[in-house]
Swiss-Prot record:
Disulphide bridges: C7-C15, C39-C47
Protein name: Sperm protamine P1
Primary localization class, coarse: nucleus
Pfam families xref list: Protamine_P1
UniProt subunit comment: Cross-linked by interchain disulfide bonds around the DNA-helix.
Amino acid sequence: MVRYRCCRSQSRSRCRRRRRRCRRRRRRCCQRRRVRKCCRRTYTLRCRRY
């Protein structure tokens, strides 16, 4: 199974708009590719494979 972790390439201002949604779901990072959801702590939008 491929996992993704947070990447800080996106601007935080865009991330803050989705802050509530992200906190509610409690996801640290995106689970799929190209899915724009904030990470739980850093609130970044993109994820990187690892």
